[in-house]
Amino acid sequence: MKHIVIIGGGFAGVSTAHRFLKNVGKSTTAPYKVTLVSRDSHFFWNIAAPRGIIPGQIPEEKLFQPIAEGFSQYGPDKFEFVLGTATDLDVGGKTLVVDVDGKATRISYDYLIIGSGSRTKIPGPFKSDGSTDGVKQTIHDFQERVKAAKTIVVVGAGPTGVETAGELAFEYGTSKKIILISGGPTVLENRPASVTKTALKQLETLNVDVRVNTKAKDPVTLPDGKKELTLSGGEKLVVDLYIPTFGVLPNSSFVPSQYLDSNGFVQVDQYFQVKGAEGVFAIGDVSDSEAPQFWFVEKQSVHIAKNLILSLSGKAPTPYKASATGMMGLQIGKNSGTGHFGNFKLPGFLVKTIRKTLFVENLPKTVDGSML
């Protein structure tokens, strides 16, 4: 029996497991079992996190769904869920070491898919940083702090920062001071100029105070609990709530260093196989294949699931062609948005309509595989 072990309880891991389990029986009668390893008991719909930190906007059950229940249709002979954290990988021995309730558990594999994702450089509400309970508590804490704050600064003007500032300003733009700090000359740097211009205008319409070409040093906590930031121009900014949205780190600490690039991302070839590691593959944010964006992860998941089935059927896998087209869509408050496909700017009304709910209705269908 072939044992496929998948690491990660997010989009990469859960979607790949479902795609394989739903389709493998159509192509081969070879015996198999899938084990999904996740440090999170629940799937976190972090696409909606910028709105989720605002009190009363999104119920907890629309942000989190239990993973194991979503796989109940396959039966224990075909699927097993392991709640634990990957701590070590023995490529030669084809063994993964997982910390399960403080105990080191060794899991052997024939194929290993690493879809462990990434985390923010500074722990916050946008990605899980260890457990479902932990990120739930973080979101609840942020909701309380957002409610109480009179001045909020968002540092980092990439998509997460812009969406977060937009959501906050839509709700509180006339009652709280919302500041967005960008280290570059505009927001959404390296995106088409027409998109950055539109985003900037939409933010300003919502009363966001956008500071460009500005760096902020790590904040100092004052005796009253407020944060003091020293900006690159020398200005000292005192705020009630500091929200960092810059930088991600791959969750690859368990992978031997020879398989990682200088930034800690897993190096893969055109088949998503980890370079130099037979039978080990990596997709999504943890790999060096494409930008860490949802639609790229979906494409990669489809491809790796098909290749796994081909391998079990004794057929050659097919190479993946990475996308050379940049794309983005984001909501800026509930009534505006912008985005692009390549150099083509997407109409704001289209982005707003598509992203109106931040896709929370797709969470249950993603976890149980019914929308794949």
From Swiss-Prot:
Lineage top rank: taxon: Eukaryota
Protein name: Oxidoreductase ptaL
Function: Oxidoreductase; part of the gene cluster that mediates the biosynthesis of pestheic acid, a diphenyl ether which is a biosynthetic precursor of the unique chloropupukeananes. The biosynthesis initiates from condensation of acetate and malonate units catalyzed by the non-reducing PKS ptaA. As the ptaA protein is TE/CLC domain-deficient, hydrolysis and Claisen cyclization of the polyketide could be catalyzed by ptaB containing a beta-lactamase domain.
Assigned EC number: 1.-.-.-
Keyword Oxidoreductase: yes
This protein's record includes keyword Zinc-finger: no
Signal peptide: 1-16
Originating species: Pestalotiopsis fici (strain W106-1 / CGMCC3.15140)
Membership in a protein family: Belongs to the FAD-dependent oxidoreductase family.
A Pfam family per the record: Pyr_redox_2
Coiled-coil residues: none
